[in-house]
Design a protein with these regions (language model features):
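C-terminal motif of bacterial Sec signal peptides marking the signal peptidase cleavage site
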Residues: 16-18
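Aromatic-rich carbohydrate-binding modules that target alpha-glucans
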Residues: 32-74, 82-111
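Extracytoplasmic
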Residues: 64, 72-76, 95-123, 129, ...
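Acidic/polar, glycine-enriched structural segments that form the non-catalytic walls/loops
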Residues: 154-277, 357-369, 373-380, 439-441, ...
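Extended glycan-interaction surfaces of carbohydrate-active proteins
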Residues: 191-199, 231-280, 304-336, 384-419, ...
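Aromatic-rich carbohydrate-recognition surfaces in CAZymes
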Residues: 216, 276-394, 421-429, 539-561, ...
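Non-catalytic carbohydrate-binding regions of carbohydrate-active enzymes
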Residues: 442-478, 507-666
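Beta-strand-rich modules
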Residues: 777-795
Length: 959
C-alpha cells in the first residue's frame, strides 16, 4: 500500500461519525514494501550469493539498511533478490560515498555499462565497516547511500566487530612464530599457539599480520575435533591440520542452496557445500576434492554428493539413454557440450570406490559404471571429433572465458565448444579407463571397447597436444579447419596427464622442470592474459597446487614438491583459511593495483572464498597422502610417505616424529608414526622409506632412510612485480585483429598488432613471425584467416577472431519464417519440431570435404551460464535419401535479442554434381535432465528447452 493511500484512509476517519474513538479500534496502516522479495547486496567482497550480512534489512517506509565488513579494493555488485529476478545497478560510473545515487533496473543490453554484466562498481580505500542505506519511491529505481559505519552501527550487525588478535593466544602454554617473506622484502608474521599440548582434544590459536580478504578478524581459535588429527613437535603443523579439519566440518551441511535453483530455497542433502561463499554442489569441485582425499576422510558424505550429481532424464523427454547421466553444471553458452568436463566425476568415484567395501562397494560401482557409460556414449556423439580422435569442449575448471581464452570468445562461445582442451581430454581418458575396469564385471563387450578407446585417446593426446619445443602439453587446440596448438599451458592439465599415465616418464620430468613457478607457488595458467584481472588468470589455486605436488612426487622433482608444499602451507597460514585462490606473484588473497598507481580494474582475485572445498581437499592431500603416505588405489591401505629435506628442516623442524591418528578406513582406525632424521642444512633431497611395520591394532611405524639428493629443478620466475601488467616475461601479447576483403581473384588481409604475427588460413600457417601489415593471398575455395601476436620472449597470443571469405551455399529450412531484424528472418526449431528439412536440395560444385553450420539466434540465457545450449543432429542425405554424413550442431547462447552467430560446424565429404538434402533432428541438452527441474531460468521449471531461431544452413568447401 502506497503511503499517500494510507494517509488518505486515515484522514477520512478524522471527526466523522462511525469512526471509533477508542485507540484500540483505530485502523493500523500496513507498511507493505514496494519490493516484496528479500533484497541483498550481491558481489561485495566477491560474494555473489546471499550471505546473512548482505541482506538489506527492512526498516519500514520502503527503507532498508545493512552494515558490511568490507576489504580494501574495487568491488562489483548489484542490489538483487535471491533468484536474480530483480536487479538494480548503478552502471554508468563508479559509485560514490556519502551521496544518494539512483540504482536502475539492469538494462537489456550492456552498451552503456562499465562492464560486461552491468554491475555497479565501488572502490574502498580502507577496510572496515560500511553502512548501505537503500530506499524506494517506486519500482523503477532505488536510491542508495554508502557511508562509513560508526562503532554503534557496526556492533548492531556484528557482535564481534572489534577483536584483538592477541586474545586468541591467551592462556596458551606453547607458541610458535613463523615469518613468511613477501615479494617486496617485507614479511608477514603468523603466530601459532596451543593451550595444552597434551590434551586429548587441543585448543589452538592462530593470528596473522596479513591483510585478510573480506576484512575478516586477524585471529581465530580452533578447537580440535574427534577424528583424524596430527601430533608433532611443531605447533604450526598441528594447528593448520586442525584448522583444515574444522573447515571440512563447516563444509558438511544438511542443506544446500543456489540462486539458480529452487528460488534459492534450501534443498535437503547431507553433502559438502563448495565454500564459504558457494552453498551448492558442483560436479567438478566435488570430484576433484573427493579425489584429493575427501573420499577417504568422509566416504558417506562424498558418496551422497556424487549421487546428487547424477540425473536421469525427465519423464517428458524421450530419455535417450537408459538411466542416469553425470550432470554438467550451468556454464558457458548454456553448458554441455560446450562444457564437457563432467567426466571429472569419475575421478571422485574412483577414489571413493577405493574406500568402500562389500555391498556398499557393489551398489555404488554398478551405479557409477552405468552413469559413466551413459555419459561416455553421449559425449562420443556430441563432443567427439573423429578426425582428431579428441573430445571437444572447454578447459576443465578454467571456465571464465576471457580469463584464459581470446578476448572475443565471450561473444562467440561456439569457438570454445569446438576447441579441444588437454585437461578435458585427460579426464575423459580417466573416465574411459574406469569404465573399462568396471565393465569387466558388468559388460565384457564394453570392457574391450573402452580399453581401445582409452588407448586411442592417449595416443591422440600425445600426438596433438605435446609441444616438444616447450617440453609441455599445450592447454588447448583451436579449431580453424585444422587444429592450431595454442601457446598456452595449464598446470591442472599437465599434472593430470602425468599422474594419469598419459605422459611418459621423460615427458613428465620435462613438464615439471619447464612449467613456470613463482616463489609463492605454481600458476594455474601460463603465460598470463594481458588486461585481465586476477581469477584464473595470474592465480594460484591450491587444489591445482595439490595436483602439481602429486606430479612432483611421481617424478621425484624435489624442487617442485617443496614449492607446492610451502605454497599450500603459506596460503592457509597467512589467510587463516584454505582460500579459493591467490595472486601468483605475491601469494596474496588480494592484490590492490591502485596501491602502486596501477589500474584498479585489475584488482583480484575478483572472487575468493574462504574454506573452499577443493582447497581443503588439497591441504589434506598434502598431509595425508604426501607426508604420511596413505594410499588406497588398490583398495587396501598402503603407507608410502614422501618427505623432503626442506619439509624436515622447516615445516617439521621441532619434531622428532610425527603421527597421524584416528584415520578411519573401511571400518577400522589406523595411525601412522614416522621417525624423522636429524635436521640438516641440505634442502635439496628427500628421505626414502626404509621400513614400514604395522601391529595388530593398525598402528603403522615408518623408518626413513638416508637423504637422497636428486637432480631436480623448476623454472622459477623472479623480479616481476605482481601489479605489473605488461611484462613480456610472464604475459602473452594481446591477439591481433584482422580485416579481410576479396579483391578481384585474391584476398587482402589487414593485420593489426604492435607485435610480429603468425598468419593462418584454414589452420595452415601461411606467414610466420612477420610484421603486422597487409598481406595478399589467393586461396582455393572458402578461406578462414586468423593470426597470433608474438612478443619479444617468443610467447604467442591466443588466436584472433577468424574472418572468412569465399563462395558458400545457403539453404533455408522448411517452416514458417518470422522477421528477427532488418533483412534477417528465422524459423524456430524446437524440441517438438520433429524432422526439419531443407526447403530445397543443393548440388556439390566439386568433390571434397564441406563444412555445414547453422546461422542462428539463441537468447535463452546469458553467455556465461544456463542449460539451454541448443544441440541438434544435422543429417546430410543424397538424392536416394541415404545419410552420407551427420554430426551434432551446437548453438550456444549469444546474449543478444537480435544477434546472429554461426553454430559449431560438422564436416561431410560430398561428390561433385550430386544432389543432397539436409535435415535437422532433436538431440538433448542439460535441460532434459531431472536434476534441472528446479532450475528457475529457461529449460528449468517450465520444462526442457532445446530451441534456436535459424535463418539458414551454411555450406562451405574446406579445401
Amino acid at each position: 500500500m502506497k503511503p499517500s493511500f494510507i494517509a488518505l484512509a486515515v484522514a477520512s476517519c478524522i471527526g466523522l461519525a462511525g469512526c471509533g474513538s477508542d485507540s484500540s479500534d483505530a485502523p493500523v496502516p500496513v507498511d507493505k514494501p514496494i519490493i516484496s522479495a528479500d533484497l541483498y547486496l550481491r558481489g561485495l567482497n566477491g560474494d555473489w550469493g546471499t550471505a546473512e550480512h548482505a541482506k538489506l534489512n527492512y526498516l519500514g517506509n520502503n527503507e532498508y539498511e545493512t552494515v558490511l565488513r568490507v576489504a580494501r579494493g574495487s568491488n562489483q555488485f548489484k542490489i538483487a533478490d535471491p533468484g536474480w529476478q530483480i536487479q538494480y545497478t548503478y552502471f554508468e560510473e563508479p559509485a560514490a560515498f556519502d551521496k544518494a545515487q539512483e540504482y536502475l533496473p539492469k538494462p537489456d543490453t550492456n552498451e552503456a555499462c562499465m562492464n560486461d554484466d552491468c554491475n555497479s562498481e565501488i572502490t574502498f580505500e580502507d577496510k572496515g565497516y560500511y553502512k548501505f542505506s537503500v530506499s524506494f519511491a517506486d519500482e523503477s529505481r532505488a536510491s542508495m547511500t554508502v557511508t562509513k559505519a560508526t562503532q554503534e552501527e557496526a556492533e548492531k550487525y556484528y557482535s564481534d566487530a572489534i577483536l584483538d588478535p592477541a586474545m586468541v593466544h591467551e592462556g596458551h602454554q606453547s607458541k610458535e612464530v613463523k615469518l613468511f617473506a613477501n615479494y617486496d622484502d617485507s614479511s608477514d608474521t603468523v603466530i601459532f599457539s596451543v593451550k595444552d599440548p597434551k590434551a586429548e582434544l587441543r585448543e589452538f590459536g592462530i593470528s596473522t599480520t596479513t591483510e585478510l580478504r573480506d576484512a575478516l578478524d586477524q585471529g581465530l581459535v580452533i578447537n580440535e575435533q574427534t577424528g583424524p588429527r596430527v601430533v608433532s613437535g611443531d605447533v604450526a603443523f598441528d594447528a593448520l591440520f586442525a584448522l583444515t579439519m574444522k573447515e571440512l566440518d563447516q563444509l558438511a551441511v544438511s542443506e544446500i542452496k543456489d540462486g539458480n535453483y529452487n528460488y534459492n530455497n534450501p534443498i535437503k542433502a547431507e553433502v559438502f557445500e563448495t565454500g564459504a561463499k558457494w552453498h551448492y554442489v558442483w560436479t567438478r569441485d566435488l570430484a576433484y576434492a573427493a579425489d584429493l582425499s575427501l573420499a577417504l576422510m568422509n566416504p558417506t558424505r562424498v558418496q551422497n554428493g556424487l549421487n546428487f550429481k547424477l540425473s536421469a532424464f525427465r519423464d517428458t523427454t524421450d530419455q535417450q539413454y537408459d538411466g542416469e547421466q553425470i550432470v554438467q553444471d550451468t556454464g558457458t553458452g548454456g553448458s554441455w557440450p560446450i562444457s564437457t568436463d563432467r567426466t571429472t566425476w569419475a575421478l571422485g568415484a574412483e577414489r571413493l570406490l577405493s574406500a568402500l567395501d562389500g555391498e556398499e562397494y557393489n551398489q555404488f560401482a554398478e551405479r557409477a559404471y552405468k552413469a559413466i557409460s551413459n555419459t561416455l556414449e553421449a559425449d562420443r556423439l556430441a563432443a567427439f571429433d573423429a578426425k582428431s580422435g579428441l573430445y571437444t569442449g572447454e578447459q576443465s575448471f578454467l571456465d571464465w572465458r576471457e580469463q584464459t581464452y581470446s578476448t572475443w570468445t565471450p561473444n562467440d562461445v561456439n569457438a570454445i565448444g569446438s576447441s579441444k582442451a588437454l585437461s578435458t581430454n585427460v579426464v575423459h581418458y580417466r573416465a574411459i579407463q574406469l569404465a573399462a575396469k568396471l565393465a569387466e564385471k558388468y559388460d565384457s563387450t564394453n570392457a574391450v571397447k573402452y580399453t581401445e578407446w582409452a588407448e586411442q585417446l592417449k595416443t591422440a593426446i600425445n600426438d596433438q597436444f605435446w609441444n616438444a619445443e616447450r617440453g609441455m602439453y599445450v592447454s588447448y587446440l583451436f579449431d580453424n579447419g585444422k587444429d592450431i596448438a595454442v601457446d598456452k599451458y595449464d598446470m591442472l592439465g599437465e599434472a593430470l596427464a602425468i599422474i594419469s599415465g598419459v605422459a611418459s616418464d621423460a615427458q613428465a620430468k620435462q613438464i615439471m622442470a619447464n612449467y613456470p613457478h613463482s616463489e609463492f607457488g605454481v600458476p594455474v595458467y601460463f603465460p598470463q592474459q594481458p588486461d585481465v584481472p586476477v581469477y584464473h588468470n595470474r592465480a594460484i589455486w591450491p587444489f591445482v597446487t595439490a595436483y602439481s605436488l602429486r606430479a612432483a612426487h611421481q617424478t621425484q622433482n624435489v624442487a617442485a614438491a617443496n614449492n607446492a608444499i610451502q605454497s599450500l602451507v603459506r596460503g592457509t597460514a597467512t589467510n587463516l583459511s584454505n582460500m579459493e585462490n591467490l595472486e601468483w606473484l605475491s601469494g596474496k588473497s588480494f592484490i590492490i593495483h591502485s596501491d602502486h598507481g596501477e589500474d584498479p580494474s585489475m584488482d583480484g582475485p575478483v572472487i575468493n572464498s574462504q574454506r573452499q572445498l577443493w582447497s581443503v581437499g588439497g591441504y589434506l592431500n598434502m598431509v595425508v597422502e604426501t607426508l604420511f603416505g596413505i594410499h588406497t588405489e588398490t583398495g587396501k591401505l598402503e603407507v608410502k610417505p614422501f618427505i623432503t629435506s626442506w619439509v624436515r628442516n622447516n615445516l617439521l623442524a621441532q619434531s622428532e616424529q610425527i603421527t597421524l591418528e584416528n584415520f578411519a578406513f573401511k571400518g577400522k582406525n589406523y595411525s601412522v608414526t614416522i621417525d624423522l632424521p636429524e635436521v640438516s642444512k641440505d634442502d635439496t633431497g628427500y628421505y626414502p622409506v626404509e621400513n614400514v611395520t604395522m601391529d595388530d591394532e593398525g598402528h603403522f611405524h615408518v623408518t626413513l632412510g638416508a637423504l637422497v639428493n636428486v637432480d631436480s629443478s623448476i623454472t622459477l620466475v623472479s623480479g616481476v612485480k605482481p601489479y605489473a601488467s605488461e611484462d613480456s616475461r610472464v604475459y602473452s601479447p594481446q591477439e591481433p585483429t584482422l580485416v579481410v576483403k576479396s579483391v578481384d581473384n585474391s584476398v587482402s588481409i589487414d593485420v593489426t598488432s604492435k607485435y610480429n604475427v603468425n598468419l593462418y588460413r584454414n589452420g595452415e600457417l601461411i606467414q610466420k613471425n612477420v610484421i603486422a601489415q597487409s598481406y595478399s593471398d589467393t586461396p582455393t575455395g572458402f578461406a578462414c584467416y586468423l593470426a597470433e601476436s608474438i612478443n619479444d620472449k617468443g610467447f604467442r597470443s591466443n588466436p584472433s577472431q577468424p574472418v572468412c571469405v569465399g563462395e558458400e551455399i545457403r539453404i533455408k529450412l522448411d517452416g514458417e519464417y518470422q522477421p528477427l531484424k532488418d533483412n534477417v528472418s528465422v524459423v524456430t526449431v524446437s524440441k517438438d519440431s520433429g524432422i526439419v528439412k531443407g526447403a530445397e536440395s543443393f548440388t556439390a560444385p566439386v568433390t571434397g570435404t564441406y563444412q555445414f553450420d547453422a546461422w542462428y539466434n539463441n537468447n535463452l540465457g546469458q553467455l556465461n551460464t544456463g542449460i539451454t545450449n541448443t544441440v541438434k543432429l544435422l543429417e546430410v542425405l543424397d538424392d536416394a535419401g541415404k545419410v552420407v554424413g551427420q554430426g551434432y550442431l551446437q548453438m550456444g547462447h549469444i546474449g543478444e535479442n537480435q544477434g546472429m552467430r554461426y553454430s559449431t560446424p560438422i564436416e561431410v565429404t560430398l561428390e561433385q554434381g550430386k544432389t543432397y538434402q539436409v535435415a535437422l533432428k532433436d538431440h538433448f541438452n542439460m535441460s532434459y535432465l531431472k536434476s534441472n527441474e528446479t532450475y528457475i531460468y529457461a529449460g528449468g521449471i517450465e520444462g526442457e528447452k532445446n530451441e534456436a531461431q535459424i535463418a539458414d544452413i551454411r555450406i562451405t568447401p574446406l579445401m
